[in-house]
Every structure is written in C-alpha cells, then in structure tokens.
C-alpha cells in the first residue's frame, strides 16, 4: 500500500460548531495521521487563489464568501491511500446524499456549508498542501 498525503480543511461551519476534535478523531481512528495543522482565517485573496480552478463556476463567489466567513482548520493527513480514505470519511459533497456515519452526514448543514474539504487526487493534494504549508512545516510521523 502506498503512503500518501492529502490536504484537509475543516470549514468555517464545522469550526463554529466546535467539532474539530470529533473530525480529527475520525481521521486518526481510520489510520490517518495529522502531520501538519494550522488554524487561520483565510483572506479573500487566499480563498480565491485556492479555489481558482472553480473561478468560472456559478458557485465560486458564494464559496469564497463562505470560506472567508470564519476561521478554518487546515491539515495535512498522511497514511495508506490517504486521498481516497479521506474522501470516503468525508462522504458525498451534499450531506443529504452522504452515507450515514460520514463527516458530512454527521456535521454538515448543506451542500455549501459541508464541513470539510479534501483533495480529490494525489496531484491536487501536492498542489494544495504546498499552497498552505512549506516543506519544513510538514512533520512525517
């Protein structure tokens, strides 16, 4: 099995609900290690840059507004098949369609306020990790 890294963000809605620890427990209980983490309040520029791939999509402005509405918790997860494992733990983007027991089914309110972000591929994980963390901020365990 391949040890991978993926980027995860606990979004403003979940931070406001004080469920960061519960979400971290899901990661760690399922074999993912947190190898870097920081809480930050994204600037508009940071949010627009991070989600630039969606710039032409109709939801882009609402997504940016939501992501700058409060602090987020950004972390790098490491483990076997980390990208896929994290996506399975998160559940479907729309919490109404997410399987019971997934992070979004348990903690998200809507397709917009959906508690967490996770990289969708190894390639994007590398780009997203580098967006928020320097190599010296990631601590292999």
UniProtKB/Swiss-Prot annotation:
SUPFAM superfamilies: Nucleoside diphosphate kinase, NDK (SSF54919). It catalyses: a 2'-deoxyribonucleoside 5'-diphosphate + ATP = a 2'-deoxyribonucleoside 5'-triphosphate + ADP; a ribonucleoside 5'-diphosphate + ATP = a ribonucleoside 5'-triphosphate + ADP. Transmembrane segments: none annotated. Its EC number is 2.7.4.6. It is found in: Cytoplasm. ATP binds at residues 11, 59, 87, 93, 104, 114. The active site is at residue 117. Keywords: ATP-binding, Cytoplasm, Kinase, Magnesium, Metal-binding, Nucleotide metabolism, Nucleotide-binding, Phosphoprotein, Transferase. GO terms for molecular function: ATP binding; metal ion binding; nucleoside diphosphate kinase activity. It holds the Pfam family NDK. PROSITE patterns: NDPK, NDPK_LIKE. Coiled coil: none annotated. Major role in the synthesis of nucleoside triphosphates other than ATP. The ATP gamma phosphate is transferred to the NDP beta phosphate via a ping-pong mechanism, using a phosphorylated active-site intermediate. PANTHER family: NUCLEOSIDE DIPHOSPHATE KINASE. Homotetramer. This is Nucleoside diphosphate kinase. It comes from Laribacter hongkongensis (strain HLHK9).
């Amino acid at each position: 099995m391949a040890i991978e890294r993926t980027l995860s963000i606990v979004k403003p809605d979940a931070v406001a609900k004080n469920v960061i620890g519960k979400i971290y427990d899901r990661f760690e209980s399922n074999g993912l290690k947190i190898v870097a983490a920081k809480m930050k309040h994204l600037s508009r520029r940071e949010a627009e840059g991070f989600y630039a791939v969606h710039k032409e999509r109709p939801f882009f402005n609402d997504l940016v507004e939501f992501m700058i509405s409060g602090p987020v918790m950004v972390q790098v997860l490491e483990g076997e098949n980390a990208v896929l494992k994290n996506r399975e733990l998160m559940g479907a983007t729309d919490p109404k369609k997410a399987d019971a027991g997934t992070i979004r089914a348990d903690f998200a309110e809507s397709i917009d306020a959906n508690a967490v972000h996770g990289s969708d591929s190894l390639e994007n994980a590398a780009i997203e990790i580098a967006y928020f963390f320097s190599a010296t901020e990631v601590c292999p365990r």
